[in-house]
A protein has these predicted regions:
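Fe(II)/2-oxoglutarate oxygenase catalytic core
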Residues: 20-78, 82-286, 290-322
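Short intrinsically disordered, low-complexity segments
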Residues: 8-9, 183
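Residue-level detector of alpha-helix boundary/anchor positions
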Residues: 1-2, 11, 138
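Tryptophan (W) side chains
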Residues: 3-6, 32
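Aromatic (phenylalanine/tyrosine) cluster motif
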Residues: 10, 14-17, 21
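Cationic, low-complexity basic patches in intrinsically disordered or flexible, solvent-exposed regions
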Residues: 7-8, 28
Length: 322
C-alpha cells in the first residue's frame, strides 16, 4: 500500500496558534488518517467519527494537544480514545479543560442536587445492579430514542464525554448518525425552506412516552426554542437539529410540524448511515451534540452490568443567538 504525505495547518477562533496536521492518504481506496500533535487519528465512518490513539487523557494535556482535540471534534464529531484509565476526578478535570461542565439534569431535577458526573447503565452508587424491572431501568429506555443531549435546555450540550468502566457482553451499543451529512443530502430547495425555522424542544414531551416524569424534574425543564438549522462557528458546516425532544415547529400546526420533523429524522437515521459503537472497557468517547444524533441499544440488565461515567460540556449559548 502506498501513502501520499502532506501537511496542513489550521488556525481558528478557538486556537491562538496553528495546529499542524500530517495527513497520510492511502491509494487507491482513499482511506486516510492523520497525525495531529502526536495523536494518531483514524476515521471510523464515511460521514464522521475517528479512533484516536497516542494520548493519555488522564494526564495533563498541554495547550496544543487540547486545541488539537477541539479541532478534531469540529472535524470528526465523534472521537473514541481506547484504553483510557480515568477516575472521576481526572475525567472532570479533563472536561473542564475542554469547556464548562453541565449540571446533570436528572439528579438536579429529581433531587435538587448539583452534580457534574452521572452513571449511564444499571449500577447504583453502592455497586449493586438494577434489573430490567427497576423503575430507573424503564425510565432510561428514553435514551433508546434518537436524540441530542440536552436539546431541551436553553443552552444545550456542546459535547458529551463518556468513559466505559463495565460493559455487557451482548447489547448495550450506542448508535450515531450525522445530521450534518443528512442536511447535505437535502436538495437546495428544502434546505432554504427549513433554514429559518424555530423548533420547540420539550423534555416532558419525549420522556413521557416511556415513563412518568417527576413534577420537580418537569418544572426544572420547561420547553425551549431552538434553531432547526445550526452552523458550526469554526468550520461553517451546517446541520439540522432534531430528535425525540423536538415537539413542534413554531408557528406551524401539530400535523405539519410532526410530518416535517419525522421526515427529517428519518432522513438522518437511515440504516446505511448509522455507526454502531460497540463499547469496550476503557473507551472514552467524545461526541458533538450540535450535529450528531445518538440512541442506546437494549441489553439484559438482569444478566449484565453496565457502568459508564458521563460528563457533558455546556454549549456557548442559546442556539437562537448562533
Amino acid at each position: 500500500m502506498s501513502w501520499t504525505v502532506w501537511q496542513r495547518s489550521y488556525k481558528g477562533p478557538y486556537f491562538p496558534f496553528p495546529i499542524n496536521y500530517v495527513v497520510l492518504t492511502s491509494q487507491p481506496d482513499g482511506r486516510w488518517r492523520a497525525m495531529v500533535s502526536g495523536m494518531d487519528i483514524e476515521p471510523l465512518h464515511p460521514d464522521f467519527g475517528a479512533r484516536v490513539t497516542g494520548v493519555d487523557l488522564g494526564a495533563p494535556l498541554d495547550g496544543r494537544s487540547l486545541s488539537a482535540v477541539r479541532r478534531a471534534i469540529d472535524d470528526y464529531s465523534f472521537l473514541c480514545f481506547p484504553d483510557q484509565a480515568l477516575d472521576d476526578d481526572s475525567q472532570l478535570a479533563f472536561t473542564r479543560r475542554i469547556g464548562e461542565p453541565e449540571v446533570d439534569h436528572v439528579r438536579f431535577g429529581r433531587d435538587g442536587v448539583v452534580e457534574y458526573l452521572s452513571t449511564i447503565g444499571n449500577i447504583e452508587d453502592d455497586g449493586s445492579r438494577r434489573g430490567n424491572d427497576h423503575e430507573l431501568t424503564k425510565y432510561f429506555t428514553g435514551n433508546n430514542m434518537w436524540h441530542s443531549d440536552s436539546s431541551f435546555r436553553d443552552v444545550p450540550t456542546f459535547v458529551t464525554i463518556t468513559h466505559a468502566h463495565e460493559v455487557p457482553d451482548q447489547g448495550g451499543e450506542t448508535e450515531f448518525v450525522s445530521a450534518r451529512a443528512a442536511y447535505g443530502r437535502l436538495p437546495e430547495g428544502p434546505r432554504h425552506e427549513i433554514d429559518p425555522l424555530i423548533v420547540i424542544h420539550d423534555y416532558v414531551y419525549s420522556r413521557s412516552r416511556v415513563a412518568p416524569v417527576k413534577q420537580s424534574h418537569a418544572d426544572s425543564l420547561p420547553p425551549v426554542e431552538q434553531k432547526l438549522v445550526r452552523t458550526n462557528p469554526a468550520t461553517g458546516a451546517r446541520n439540522y437539529y432534531v430528535g425525540s425532544h423536538a415537539r413542534c415547529v413554531v408557528g406551524w400546526n401539530e400535523a405539519d410540524s410532526r410530518a416535517l420533523l419525522d421526515d427529517l429524522l428519518a432522513g438522518a437515521t437511515r440504516r446505511e448511515d448509522i455507526y454502531s459503537h460497540r463499547w469496550r472497557r476503557g473507551d472514552l468517547v467524545i461526541w458533538d451534540n450540535r450535529c450528531l444524533l445518538h440512541r442506546g441499544r437494549l441489553y439484559d440488565a438482569d444478566r449484565y452490568r453496565r457502568r459508564m461515567r458521563q460528563t457533558r460540556i455546556r454549549g456557548a449559548g442559546s442556539t437562537l443567538q448562533e
